[in-house]
């Protein structure tokens, strides 16, 4: 049975109400870190986009590696230990040490609050 004009009008009205989906970015956090390190330096939209893509890529790789570790160990729960190991596997030397220490600090701060 074809849609009645009233139903069609209602559907068109509902379609008009759809809003553009908001995309989450790390721009605010990238900017905060930039200002902590170099207060006098700015960043272009293109550079911010590249940094955002980089962070999304790294987080995706860490999540993928951590999920593999969970499966290898025949576990069902992803814990901070798997994430920490994934970071150690993916990031080189000193960068991994700093990432692990900052991550541990963040988890401690979160659990204590």
Swiss-Prot record:
Monoubiquitination of Lys-109 gives a specific tag for epigenetic transcriptional activation and is also prerequisite for histone H3 'Lys-4' and 'Lys-79' methylation. InterPro entries: Histone-fold (IPR009072), Histone_H2A/H2B/H3 (IPR007125), Histone_H2B (IPR000558), HISTONE_H2B_site (IPR055333). PROSITE patterns: HISTONE_H2B. GO terms for molecular function: DNA binding; protein heterodimerization activity; structural constituent of chromatin. Its main location: nucleus. There is a cross-link at residue 109 (Glycyl lysine isopeptide (Lys-Gly) (interchain with G-Cter in ubiquitin)). GO terms for cellular component: nucleosome; nucleus. SUPFAM superfamilies: Histone-fold. It is found in: Nucleus; Chromosome. Keywords: Chromosome, DNA-binding, Isopeptide bond, Nucleosome core, Nucleus, Ubl conjugation. Residues 7-21 have a biased composition (Basic residues). It holds the Pfam family Histone. Residues 1-21 are annotated as: Disordered. It comes from the Eukaryota. The nucleosome is a histone octamer containing two molecules each of H2A, H2B, H3 and H4 assembled in one H3-H4 heterotetramer and two H2A-H2B heterodimers. The octamer wraps approximately 147 bp of DNA. Belongs to the histone H2B family. Core component of nucleosome. Nucleosomes wrap and compact DNA into chromatin, limiting DNA accessibility to the cellular machineries which require DNA as a template. Histones thereby play a central role in transcription regulation, DNA repair, DNA replication and chromosomal stability. DNA accessibility is regulated via a complex set of post-translational modifications of histones, also called histone code, and nucleosome remodeling. This is Histone H2B. The gene is H2B1.
């Amino acid at each position: 049975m074809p849609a009645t004009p009233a139903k069609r009008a209602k559907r068109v009205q509902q379609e008009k109400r759809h809003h553009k989906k908001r995309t989450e970015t790390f721009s605010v956090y990238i900017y905060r870190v930039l200002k902590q390190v170099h207060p006098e330096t700015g960043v272009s939209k293109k550079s911010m986009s590249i940094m955002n893509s980089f962070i999304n890529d790294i987080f995706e790789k860490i999540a993928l590696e951590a999920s593999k570790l969970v499966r290898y160990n025949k576990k069902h729960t992803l814990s901070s230990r798997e994430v920490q190991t994934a970071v150690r596997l993916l990031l080189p030397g000193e960068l991994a040490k700093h990432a692990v220490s900052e991550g541990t600090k963040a988890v401690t701060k979160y659990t204590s609050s």
